[in-house]
C-alpha cells in the first residue's frame, strides 16, 4: 500500500464504500467484529435515510444538549492580540460541557434501533465517558466506561460524574494506563459481547463506519458555524482552528468547510514536552502511516511498527493515532497540522480565562494557543474561529498540580 502523499484535492464525498479516505481508513479487525460492523453500517445508512431518526436526533440536540451552541466574539482577546477578530464556537456550553454529547446521543439512538441492550465506551479526558453515561441514563441503557488508571487520576471530577450517572467505571492498568489502553480493553470487551453490546467510540477513529459516523454526528458544529458566521459578519471565516487528538471536534468543525477553498483550516496536535519520541502525541506531525485500532492512519510507531508511548498533559490528546480523514486532509494538504507544547497550552488557558472569563479544557487550550499566534499575523478585517471543544472545570486539579499549587 502506498504511503506517499496523495496529489488529489480533498473531497467531501468520502469515504468510499470500503470506508477509505484516499489511502486511509478501512477496516482491520478480527472476523468476530465483521458482522457487528456490517450491522452497524447497514443500520446507520437506514437511519440517515429515515426522516423520523433525524427529527428525533435534532429534537434531542435542541432540547437535551442545548444546541445551537453560540458563536462568541472574544473582543478583549482580539484587541490584545491585535490581529484577526477571534470567535469562539462554544461547544463548552453544551450539556455535559463538551462536543462529545453530539456523538453519544446519535450512537445511543442507533443502539436502540439495533436492539442492543448494553453500551461500552472508552474515555481519556472523561468527557466522552460522561457524555456516554449521560446518553445511556437518558435512554435507560447500562453503560461500562473503560478509562486508563492514569487518566482516572487526572480527571477525578469526571470519574465521579460518570458514577453519579450510573455508569460502571473499569480502570485499565495495562500499558501506559491512558486512552490507547482504554480503547484496547473496550475492543476486547466488544469482541466477546457483540450480540447484545454496542461500542460507542468517542472519536473519528476505529474501523469503518466509525470515522464516518462520528464525523457526521459532529458536523453539526461546522454547519452551525457556517450559518452563524454569515448571520454575524456576512461571510465565511478566513480561518478555523481546532485541537486534534483522535480528532472528532476538529472533523466536525472542518468537514462542512472542506470544499470552501477560501477557508484555511488548522488542526493543533499535542506537542507535549518536546519533539523527542515519547514526549509528545503528534502523529500527523511526526508519525508514519500504520494500523491502529482497526484503521489505517498516521500513527506514532517505531521502526518495527510497534506503537510508541506518547505524552500530553491533556488526557484527551494523549493518543498515538488520529482519525483517517485527518490523515487524508493532511496528505491532500487541505488542512494544516501543527503542534503545541504543554507550556504553551497552559499559558493560553490562563490568558483566555483572564481576558474573557472562560475556562477552556486543556485540550482546547492547545487550539487557543496556536490560534492566538495565527490571528496575530492576520488583519483586523479578517475573522478566525476557534472550536472551543470543552470547558476546563475537569482540569482544575491537574492545572493546580502543574502549577505547583495546593488544591
Swiss-Prot record:
Stored Gene3D superfamilies: 3.40.50.1100
Keyword annotations: Amino-acid biosynthesis, Aromatic amino acid biosynthesis, Lyase, Pyridoxal phosphate, Tryptophan biosynthesis
Cofactor requirements of the protein: pyridoxal 5'-phosphate
PROSITE patterns: TRP_SYNTHASE_BETA (PS00168)
EC number: 4.2.1.20
An example molecular function term from Gene Ontology annotations: tryptophan synthase activity
Pathway this chain belongs to: Amino-acid biosynthesis; L-tryptophan biosynthesis; L-tryptophan from chorismate: step 5/5
Described function: The beta subunit is responsible for the synthesis of L-tryptophan from indole and L-serine.
Protein name in UniProt: Tryptophan synthase beta chain
Amino acid at each position: 500500500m502506498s504511503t506517499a502523499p496523495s496529489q488529489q484535492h480533498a473531497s467531501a464525498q468520502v469515504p468510499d464504500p470500503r470506508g477509505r479516505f484516499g489511502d486511509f481508513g478501512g477496516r482491520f479487525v478480527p472476523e468476530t467484529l465483521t458482522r457487528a460492523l456490517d450491522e452497524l453500517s447497514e443500520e446507520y445508512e437506514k437511519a440517515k435515510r429515515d426522516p423520523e431518526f433525524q427529527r428525533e436526533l435534532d429534537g434531542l440536540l435542541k432540547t437535551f444538549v442545548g444546541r445551537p451552541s453560540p458563536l462568541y466574539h472574544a473582543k478583549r482577546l482580539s484587541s490584545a492580540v491585535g490581529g484577526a477578530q477571534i470567535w469562539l464556537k462554544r461547544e463548552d456550553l453544551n450539556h455535559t460541557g463538551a462536543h462529545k454529547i453530539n456523538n453519544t446521543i446519535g450512537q445511543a439512538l442507533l443502539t436502540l434501533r439495533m436492539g442492543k441492550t448494553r453500551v461500552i465506551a472508552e474515555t481519556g479526558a472523561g468527557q466522552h465517558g460522561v457524555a456516554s453515561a449521560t446518553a445511556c441514563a437518558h435512554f435507560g441503557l447500562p453503560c461500562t466506561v473503560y478509562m486508563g488508571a492514569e487518566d482516572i487520576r487526572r480527571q477525578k471530577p469526571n470519574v465521579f460524574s460518570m458514577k453519579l450517572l450510573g455508569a460502571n467505571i473499569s480502570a485499565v492498568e495495562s500499558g501506559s494506563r491512558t486512552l490507547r489502553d482504554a480503547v484496547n480493553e473496550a475492543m476486547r470487551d466488544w469482541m466477546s459481547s457483540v450480540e447484545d453490546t454496542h461500542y460507542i467510540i468517542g472519536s473519528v477513529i476505529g474501523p469503518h463506519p466509525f470515522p464516518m459516523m462520528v464525523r457526521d454526528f459532529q458536523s453539526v458544529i461546522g454547519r452551525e458555524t457556517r450559518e452563524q458566521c454569515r448571520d454575524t459578519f456576512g461571510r465565511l471565516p478566513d480561518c478555523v482552528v481546532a485541537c486534534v487528538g483522535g480528532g472528532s471536534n476538529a472533523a466536525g468543525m472542518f468537514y462542512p468547510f472542506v470544499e470552501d477553498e477560501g477557508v484555511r483550516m488548522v488542526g493543533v496536535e499535542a506537542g507535549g514536552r518536546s519533539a523527542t519520541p515519547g514526549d509528545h502525541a503528534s502523529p500527523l506531525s511526526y508519525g508514519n502511516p500504520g494500523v491502529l485500532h482497526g484503521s489505517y492512519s498516521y500513527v506514532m510507531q517505531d521502526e518495527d511498527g510497534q506503537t510508541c508511548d506518547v505524552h500530553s498533559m491533556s488526557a484527551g490528546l494523549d493518543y498515538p493515532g488520529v482519525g483517517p480523514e485527518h490523515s487524508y486532509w493532511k496528505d491532500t494538504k487541505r488542512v494544516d497540522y501543527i503542534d503545541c507544547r504543554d507550556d504553551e497550552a497552559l499559558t493560553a488557558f490562563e490568558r483566555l480565562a483572564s481576558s474573557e472569563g472562560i475556562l477552556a479544557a486543556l485540550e482546547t487550550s492547545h487550539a487557543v494557543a496556536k490560534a492566538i499566534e495565527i490571528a496575530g499575523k492576520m488583519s483586523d478585517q479578517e475573522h478566525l474561529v476557534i472550536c472551543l471543544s470543552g470547558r476546563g472545570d475537569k482540569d482544575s486539579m491537574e492545572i493546580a498540580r502543574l502549577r505547583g499549587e495546593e488544591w
